[in-house]
Swiss-Prot record:
It catalyses: alpha-D-glucosamine 6-phosphate + H2O = beta-D-fructose 6-phosphate + NH4(+). One of its GO terms (molecular function) is identical protein binding. Its main location: cytoplasm. PANTHER family: GLUCOSAMINE-6-PHOSPHATE ISOMERASE (PTHR11280:SF5). It comes from Drosophila melanogaster (Fruit fly). This is Glucosamine-6-phosphate deaminase. It holds the Pfam family Glucosamine_iso.
Length: 273
């Protein structure tokens, strides 16, 4: 596992975008060999998406031969609902780049058979050759996608009933009306993300500091699902200073020292865990 500690949340978005651009360009995707990218929603990756859009406009990266798989989607929200993840991804990223719509994969929360939809999503990932780089964010309780505390660490894409804490946290997006908050979601499993060749997790803000501590300094625990990625061969966590507040000083110095040796701010050329 590698931890990259940067000054601000803006720095995290810029660094992550540079890394994604480098991974795509180094891969040299083509019509016969697509780069497969796993993507999250939420406020944390917005800065990364904005930077990638700029890189695309500048001609530094193309998404023509990129296939994407998103982590999750609410059950029962129309695709054009302003809180659906379809809407989020198209509005904040896809419509601004040169990706082919057929290469975008987002779970359908309105499918007639939700279990079949989840199984199809797993099949599509396999048919694409697996995910090259899966990007995620985490919640204050250490959840990734909708794999909330207590989720199986070998789980696959499935229907999840959302915890009360999640419903209450999401109410602010639905006029603070709990009756409007979707009670279920479709989500990739922890095992689904673990199958990817590389995982990059973005963590910003003091409110996620304890989750980062659990992910880095304590053992693997299904009550903190992000901790599972200690056992992935290529996990890269990118965080800001605020997110390190619960880490030991020795831990922070250790990872900062590695980054300094690799030229701080660069997209970790040739990094190895």
């Amino acid at each position: 596992m590698r931890l990259v500690i940067l000054e601000t949340s803006d720095s995290v978005g810029k660094w992550a975008a540079k890394y994604v651009m480098k991974r795509i360009n180094d891969f040299q995707p083509s019509a016969d060999r697509y780069f497969v990218l796993g993507l999250p929603t939420g406020s944390t990756p917005l800065g990364m998406y904005k930077e990638l859009i700029e890189f695309h406009k500048q001609g530094k990266v193309s998404f023509q031969y990129v296939k994407t798989f998103n982590m999750d989607e609410y059950v029962g929200l129309a695709r054009d609902h302003h809180e659906s993840y379809h809407y989020f991804m198209w509005n904040n990223f896809f419509k601004h780049i040169d990706i082919e719509p057929k290469n975008v994969h987002i779970l359908d929360g309105n499918a007639a058979d939700l279990v079949a939809e989840c199984n199809k999503f797993e099949d599509q990932i396999r048919e694409a050759g697996g995910v090259e780089l899966f990007i995620g964010g985490i919640g204050p309780d250490g959840h990734i996608a909708f794999n909330e505390p207590g989720s199986s660490l070998v789980s696959r894409t499935r229907v999840k009933t959302l915890a009360q804490d999640t419903l209450e946290a999401n109410a602010r997006f639905f006029d603070n009306d709990m009756s409007k908050v979707p009670k279920q979601a479709l989500t990739v499993g922890v095992g689904t993300v673990m199958d990817s060749k590389e995982v990059m997790i973005l963590i910003t803000g003091a409110h996620k500091a304890f989750a980062l501590y659990k992910a880095i300094e304590e053992g693997v625990n299904h009550m903190w699902t992000v901790s599972a990625f200690q056992q992935h061969a290529n996990t890269l966590m990118i965080c800001d200073e605020d997110a390190t507040l619960e880490l030991r000083v020795k831990t922070v110095k250790y990872f900062k020292g590695i980054l300094r040796d690799l030229d701080e701010g660069s997209p970790l050329e040739g990094y190895k865990n």
